[in-house]
Amino acid sequence: MQVGSKWVAFFSQTGSEIVSLIKKGYRPDLIITDNKESYDERKTFFKYFNIEFWYRPLPKSINYKVQYYDEILNSKDIVTLHGWLNIVPADTCERYTIYNGHPGHIVNYPELKG
């Protein structure tokens, strides 16, 4: 990881992949979910490992979606998406180093599958 960067992981579903990574010794600096049920279920686990964990719903407007990521991330951060069921705006993809562990919202956008 780059000096001065942090690992930020996003998930929309259960967070089981992040939990598995943590159990194997990998520690994101910050985890964000837009799923309130998963937040409530996982917050004790992440707190035990001293990992910052935020529930942060995503706004509907594309303009606010770019702002959403900009308020969370710094230019040197490494971002991983783990079942993040949101399309990340192109501007955001260009600004940050993002790795998508799973395809996007393939239920509503099957053309993204692959």
Language-model segments: residues:
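One-carbon transfer enzymes
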Residues: 1-114
